[in-house]
Amino acid sequence: MNLVGGYQHHHHHHHHHHMLHEPFLFGPAARCHQERAYFPGWVLNPAEVTPELHGQSPAYGPAEFGSGGAGRLEALSGRLGRRKGVGGPKKERRRTESINSAFAELRECIPNVPADTKLSKIKTLRLATSYIAYLMEVLARDSQPGEPEGFKAELKKADGRENKRKRETQPEVYSQPLAHGEKKLKGRTGWPQQVWALELNP
């Protein structure tokens, strides 16, 4: 009886001990797991976290954050680790120089831009897009038989005005007759200055 009673007492004590500490043992763990579920998304926000991770050691990686999103975190820490290596800054500098060189070549392809005008990358891309659209329009009109040579130069001028209205309204303005504009703008050639002037002064 005493042994059974002792066993029952021990079992009761163990059960009480388990119930007493269960909220303490599992409560924070569950809460930590919930935080980890949101943590990988926070890590992948470059505006907030990338500068901090960039200053930390490579060991500050997925092991700190739990298993949630470990693959994405490893990829992120791997990129940061390569940047901190010996070849990282040089590779990044070469990539930047390559991009700048490509933009410089693209600027040279855009006509009627003053030599002293400095174009940002976004303005260069916008001008290039407008110029490509303009060239495609010229090619489309050149494919129509019976157009006189002088009318092509006028198309470029009138097309510049239509480009402005196209961005503000709808593309159908290209179908409007251009004979009226030919008399006013006859003799002017080249890509219309209105197009790049509009982009230079947004």
From Swiss-Prot:
Q: Where is the bHLH domain?
A: 83-135
What InterPro entries does the database record attribute to this sequence? bHLH_dom, E-box_TF_Regulators, HLH_DNA-bd_sf
- Region: Disordered; residue ranges are 143-187
Pfam families with a match to the protein in the record:
HLH
Regions of compositional bias (Basic and acidic residues) in chain numbering: 149-162
* Main localization, broad class: nucleus
Q: Which GO terms describe its molecular function?
A: bHLH transcription factor binding; DNA-binding transcription activator activity, RNA polymerase II-specific; DNA-binding transcription factor activity, RNA polymerase II-specific; DNA-binding transcription repressor activity, RNA polymerase II-specific; enzyme binding; protein homodimerization activity; RNA polymerase II cis-regulatory region sequence-specific DNA binding; RNA polymerase II transcription regulatory region sequence-specific DNA binding
Q: SUPFAM superfamilies, from UniProt?
A: HLH, helix-loop-helix DNA-binding domain (SSF47459)
Task: Extract the PROSITE patterns matched here.
Answer: BHLH
Example GO CC term: the record gives: cytoplasm
Q: Where in the cell is it found?
A: Nucleus, Nucleoplasm; Nucleus, Nucleolus
List UniProt keywords, sorted A-Z. Answer: Developmental protein, DNA-binding, Nucleus, Transcription, Transcription regulation
Gene Ontology terms describing biological process: angiogenesis; cardiac left ventricle formation; cardiac right ventricle formation; cardiac septum morphogenesis; cartilage morphogenesis; cell differentiation; embryonic heart tube formation; heart development
Its assembly, as annotated, is: Efficient DNA binding requires dimerization with another bHLH protein.
Physiological role: Transcription factor. Plays an essential role in cardiac morphogenesis.
Q: What is the protein name for this chain?
A: Heart- and neural crest derivatives-expressed protein 1
Q: Which organism is this protein's natural source? A: Gallus gallus
